[in-house]
């Protein structure tokens, strides 16, 4: 989910 938002991965 947050992969593209602030680079969670």
Swiss-Prot record:
Keyword Disulfide bond: yes
Record keywords: Adaptive immunity, Blood coagulation, Coiled coil, Disulfide bond, Hemostasis, Immunity, Innate immunity, Secreted
Subcellular location: Secreted
Entry's Gene Ontology cellular component terms: extracellular region
Keyword hit for Ribonucleoprotein: no
Modified how: Conversion of fibrinogen to fibrin is triggered by thrombin, which cleaves fibrinopeptides A and B from alpha and beta chains, and thus exposes the N-terminal polymerization sites responsible for the formation of the soft clot.
Entry comment, domain topic: A long coiled coil structure formed by 3 polypeptide chains connects the central nodule to the C-terminal domains (distal nodules). The long C-terminal ends of the alpha chains fold back, contributing a fourth strand to the coiled coil structure.
Primary role: Cleaved by the protease thrombin to yield monomers which, together with fibrinogen alpha (FGA) and fibrinogen gamma (FGG), polymerize to form an insoluble fibrin matrix. Fibrin has a major function in hemostasis as one of the primary components of blood clots. In addition, functions during the early stages of wound repair to stabilize the lesion and guide cell migration during re-epithelialization. Was originally thought to be essential for platelet aggregation, based on in vitro studies using anticoagulated blood.
Subunit relationships: Heterohexamer; disulfide linked. Contains 2 sets of 3 non-identical chains (alpha, beta and gamma). The 2 heterotrimers are in head to head conformation with the N-termini in a small central domain.
Protein name: Fibrinogen beta chain
Species this protein is from: Theropithecus gelada
Lineage of the organism: Eukaryota, Metazoa, Chordata, Craniata, Vertebrata
